[in-house]
Amino acid sequence: MTVFEGNFTEDISSLRFAIVIGRFNDLVTDKLLSGCQDCLKRHGVDVNPDGTQVDYIWVPGSFEVPMVARQVALSHRYDAVICLGAIIRGQTPHFDYVAAEAAKGIAAAAFQTGVPVVFGILTTDTLQQALERAGIKSNLGWNYGLSALEMASLMRQLRPRNEDKPLELLENNPQQALMEG
């Protein structure tokens, strides 16, 4: 029996990432981005905005993140997409709607494209809780970067041998695509 698991021993320099960041609550999202970049850099990824491994895409807020994440994943130029945002509860139900739709949209982007899309949207009751999760006590941005590295590695291992086949063939008739590989 074969065991598949994401690892960090492969050639990291060949991996490409897109990071989609919500600008709203940027006091928090800037810190999440820093933590994510720190993780990727320590694992050998060139996080320079002028480099070839990471593209940064800023959107107005967490509600817009899933649409852009899906579009980016559909391009199949990236091994993983990392979504960063912060939704902080207010005094209206708005929080519930935005948080639910962001979560559903990010999951749908991954399922519909086959590209790992990491859910890095903080949903907290207070700004203090968000800041604690973005750097005061720990920085979950680091965890989101690590998840992206692991999932990118795992998905590379799970690719069909004939990855040069058109995606439509793999999706519509995976059995035939594997036999032709």
UniProtKB/Swiss-Prot annotation:
It catalyses: (2S)-2-hydroxy-3-oxobutyl phosphate + 5-amino-6-(D-ribitylamino)uracil = 6,7-dimethyl-8-(1-D-ribityl)lumazine + phosphate + 2 H2O + H(+). It is an enzyme of class 2 (transferase). The keyword Ion transport does not apply. One of its GO terms (molecular function) is 6,7-dimethyl-8-ribityllumazine synthase activity. Keywords: Riboflavin biosynthesis, Transferase. GO terms for biological process: riboflavin biosynthetic process. The active site is at H94 (proton donor). (2S)-2-hydroxy-3-oxobutyl phosphate binds at Q91, T92, R133. Pathway: Cofactor biosynthesis; riboflavin biosynthesis; riboflavin from 2-hydroxy-3-oxobutyl phosphate and 5-amino-6-(D-ribitylamino)uracil: step 1/2. InterPro entries: LS (IPR034964), LS/RS (IPR002180), LS/RS_sf (IPR036467). GO terms for cellular component: cytosol; riboflavin synthase complex. 5-amino-6-(D-ribitylamino)uracil binds at F24, S62, F63, E64, A86, I87, I88, F119. It comes from the Bacteria. Its EC number is 2.5.1.78. Catalyzes the formation of 6,7-dimethyl-8-ribityllumazine by condensation of 5-amino-6-(D-ribitylamino)uracil with 3,4-dihydroxy-2-butanone 4-phosphate. This is the penultimate step in the biosynthesis of riboflavin. NCBIfam families: lumazine-synth. Belongs to the DMRL synthase family. This is 6,7-dimethyl-8-ribityllumazine synthase.
